[in-house]
Amino acid sequence: GLVPCGETCFTGKCYTPGCSCSYPICKKN
């Protein structure tokens, strides 16, 4: 399945496809 967003993005960057940084956690686009 799809990888859920939820990584931290203290650098302002999300590496999970389809996710964007909603500091400090990546959220779905």
From Swiss-Prot:
InterPro entries: Cyclotide, Cyclotide_moebius_CS, Cyclotide_sf
Alphabetized PROSITE patterns for the sequence: CYCLOTIDE, CYCLOTIDE_MOEBIUS
Free-text description of this protein's post-translational modifications in UniProt: This is a cyclic peptide.
Cross-link named Cyclopeptide (Gly-Asn), sites: 1-29
Cystine bridges: 5-19, 9-21, 14-26
Free-text domain note: The presence of a 'disulfide through disulfide knot' structurally defines this protein as a knottin.
Protein function: Probably participates in a plant defense mechanism. Has hemolytic activity.
Family statement: Belongs to the cyclotide family. Moebius subfamily.
Name of the featured protein: Cycloviolacin-O15
